[in-house]
Amino acid sequence: VPPHEFNIDFPHLMLRYRNLERKKKKHNKVDDQLTKTDRNGKFFSKFSNLVNWSTKSSNKITRPIMELLLKIDKEAELPKFYNQTLIDHLKKDESQGQLDQTTDKVVIFPTCFVNYNNPNLGLLTKKILNKLNIKVEFFYEGCCGMPQLEGGDIKSVADKAKITSETLSKYVDKGYKVLSIV
């Protein structure tokens, strides 16, 4: 936060407030369910056509109901889901293309958004890096915890960070550079 006359770190102040609300059990339970991106992503991906139809902002049937029950503004654009996640695609095609002898290697943590809502971004990133003669590996142990951070759930974020950092450190020890998409 740039310096200003009140010298308040507003983002951290909001995080502390949300954490305090959580401790007092005054946080929004619906928001807690929406932040379970892996559970939601796995489920919604199986029904992506129906989910995408029902979450379109132009849908005059379902969006007013979502606004009433979930407090999601009916005009808000929501991310699409795909019937195959990025990890599903990668399990089917682990090829690296034609790589010359290379020592350049990258491990990509795609984030839950790319995995469930934009798998093409991950596939294109792999393709571009392979064209640049860079070996690419992906790992996805689960959501990084950013949605929980927004809700002040510091414990969940810390638990997820521990798992992610343990996995990443193994790649770093082998000489991989780390890249995260979105």
Which residues make up each language-model segment?
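Iron-sulfur-cluster electron-transfer modules
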Residues: 1-143, 148-182
